[in-house]
Amino acid sequence: HNFENVHSHTHSAHHSHRGLKEIYSIIEQTQLTENAEKLAKKIFRILAEAEAKAHATDIENVHFHEVGAVDSIVDIVAFAVCFDNLHIDRVYVPGISEGTGTIRCQHGIIPVPVPAVLNITSAYNIELSNTNIKGELVTPTGAAIVAAVRTDTALPQHFSIKKTGYGAGKREYELPGVLRAMLIESNSESLDENADLIYKLETDI
């Protein structure tokens, strides 16, 4: 059991429960590159560790509910594939913005940030910024993705922007629920001149 039924996607009410080993087995049956497979597994392990701590149990006893559903596995695997295809060397995430208040999950009403998000951001030293927006802006899956790929918190002094992408969440808030990512190339002598970089800004993931 976990808090992942607050995931921003719409799911049916019935999902099977899968352990980490079962999810690993599903990922291994796909035709992913070695790097994409490792990243997908890393994201799920971060989630499992956070849920294990939240429930005071061992990681082997964690069974995913919503995050174990096929569509959520596809979400994480798709991210891993796209990330691998971009050949990104460094990821800059200064912090992520979170909402306030409470949410309802299978365990009842719990405060925002939910325990799994707190555990991930604490374990990986990810800075959270509070907003006045009522609701959950950061899901455990989103926090796990940031934890899995972030390498730095501050941009290089000199860089050029190659591409910019936006992803909009389905929930309606006072401010746009948008994730922005920039693919940049560093002009710093300390980094490979041809290194592709990504910089994540806003968050509703």
Predicted regions and their residues:
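Mobile "lid/hinge" segments at catalytic clefts and subdomain interfaces of large enzymes
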Residues: 88-204
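Conserved phosphate/anionic-ligand binding catalytic regions in large, soluble enzymes, centered on
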Residues: 64-87
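Short acidic, glycine/Ser/Thr-rich loop/turn "cap" segments at secondary-structure junctions
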Residues: 27-34, 59-67
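Short, hydrophobic/aliphatic alpha-helical segments
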Residues: 48-62, 87, 91, 127
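Short glycine-rich or small-residue beta-strand-to-loop segments that form or flank ligand, phosphate
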Residues: 63-68, 200-204
